[in-house]
UniProtKB/Swiss-Prot annotation:
GO terms for biological process: mRNA processing; renal system process; RNA splicing. It comes from the Eukaryota. Residues 49-141 are annotated as: Required for RNA-binding. Residues 163-181 have a biased composition (Acidic residues). The gene is PRKRIP1. Residues 1-56, 113-189 are annotated as: Disordered. Required for pre-mRNA splicing as component of the spliceosome. Binds double-stranded RNA. Residues 89-181 form a coiled coil. It comes from Gallus gallus (Chicken). Residues 25-41, 113-123, 142-162 have a biased composition (Basic and acidic residues). Belongs to the PRKRIP1 family. Residues 124-141 have a biased composition (Basic residues). Residues 124-136 are annotated as: Required for nuclear localization. This is PRKR-interacting protein 1 homolog.
Length: 189
């Protein structure tokens, strides 16, 4: 018998989780992610993709059976019936796969068409934005040039006015000089 050992320490109790009922798929997914992230070391079972059902390939060799004619025996009829059922099943499967493939191709074409339309609209909007940007830049340049021209014209006007002032002051000085030396005296004859 085993020797009596010291009693085991009690396991740490897990906190009871509140019962949360997801209202929609997004909330359910969020809850699952939270549950997974509580213990990131735990491995997550990822289910394998189930193989799609496919009918058996047609038999390579078919015995000559009488089929559903009146002279056929019951065993031969059952063989014929099973072969016929499998062939119909295979044809139905091939038709369904062709339809699925056609729908997938249409869907891909539709996606491509929608993508092209979206790219065209984006390009159109981009051109419009670029044009507006260029227009704003041009307006800004014109405004700066106009300000420069105004400054230059103001400076040239100041120069001209200063030159005019200098000429006026010279003329005034000359007039003052003229006033000192009258060319004629009024009242003298």
């Amino acid at each position: 018998m085993a020797a009596p050992s010291a009693p085991r320490p009690p396991r740490p109790r897990k906190e009871p989780q509140p019962l949360v009922i997801p209202r929609n798929a997004a909330e359910e997914q969020r809850l699952r992610l939270e549950r997974l992230m509580r213990n990131p070391e735990k491995t997550v079972p990822i289910p394998e993709k189930l193989n799609e059902w496919a009918p058996r390939p047609p038999p390579e060799f078919v015995r000559d059976v009488m089929g559903s004619s009146a002279g056929a025996g019951s065993g031969e009829f059952h063989v014929y019936r099973h072969l016929r059922r499998r062939e119909y099943q295979r044809q139905d499967f091939m038709d369904a796969m062709a339809e699925k493939q056609r729908l997938d191709e249409e869907f891909q074409k539709k996606l491509e068409r929608n993508k092209m339309i979206a790219e065209e609209q984006t390009a159109k909007r981009r051109r419009k934005r670029q044009k507006l940007k260029e227009k704003k830049l041009q307006a800004k340049k014109n405004k700066l040039e106009q300000k420069k021209q105004e400054k230059e014209s103001d400076q040239s006007q100041e120069r001209v006015s200063s030159e005019d002032d200098e000429e006026d002051s010279k003329e005034e000085e000359e007039k003052e000089d003229d006033a000192e030396e009258p060319s004629f005296v009024m009242g003298r004859g």
